[in-house]
């Protein structure tokens, strides 16, 4: 749970800077975040093999975002916190590591990550009044590596590829 700040809850208007007015919102609700996590990990010593995977999901109700209203006549911006819903994200990963020879000196590893975020807030462009904005972000990553290890030397070669795509919707 996340409580709104006391200044956000007070029903007052701070116009000490006439071009940047801040209003409170006594109707703000607390934010609640729910998290869900699954995790699995296994290691087989005989084969020097490891497997790990996890999935996380998080959702926030009543997030707090500042809503801006622009006054064309005075040029003043009025900012007021508002509750907004729709913020959530999901993440997952998979890792596999194993020896590829019977002596166990050569190994390979793969680590894959996936993430999706849905972030909702208010956005004001070119002095306009705030509009609800949703940013949808997708991330995918892969790391591959191969290594050699003996009692006095360890050498690894690895490569990483990451993809990130974000889209905004007003």
Segments from the language model and where they lie:
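Exposed, low-structure sequence patches enriched in small/polar residues
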Residues: 1-170
């Amino acid at each position: 749970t996340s409580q709104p700040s006391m200044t956000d809850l007070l029903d007052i208007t701070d116009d000490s800077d006439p071009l940047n007015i801040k209003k409170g919102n006594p109707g703000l609700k607390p934010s609640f975040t729910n998290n869900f996590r699954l995790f699995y990990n296994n290691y087989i010593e005989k084969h020097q093999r490891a497997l790990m995977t996890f999935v996380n999901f998080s959702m926030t109700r009543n997030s707090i975002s500042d809503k801006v209203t622009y006054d064309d006549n005075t040029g003043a911006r009025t900012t007021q916190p508002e509750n907004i819903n729709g913020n959530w994200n999901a993440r997952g990963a998979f890792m596999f590591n194993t020896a590829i020879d019977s002596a166990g000196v050569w190994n390979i590893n793969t680590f894959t990550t996936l993430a999706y975020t849905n972030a909702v807030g208010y956005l004001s462009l070119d002095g306009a009044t705030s509009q609800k904005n949703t940013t949808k972000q997708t991330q995918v990553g892969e790391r591959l590596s191969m290594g050699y290890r003996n009692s006095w030397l360890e050498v690894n070669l690895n490569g990483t590829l990451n993809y990130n795509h974000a889209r905004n919707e007003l």
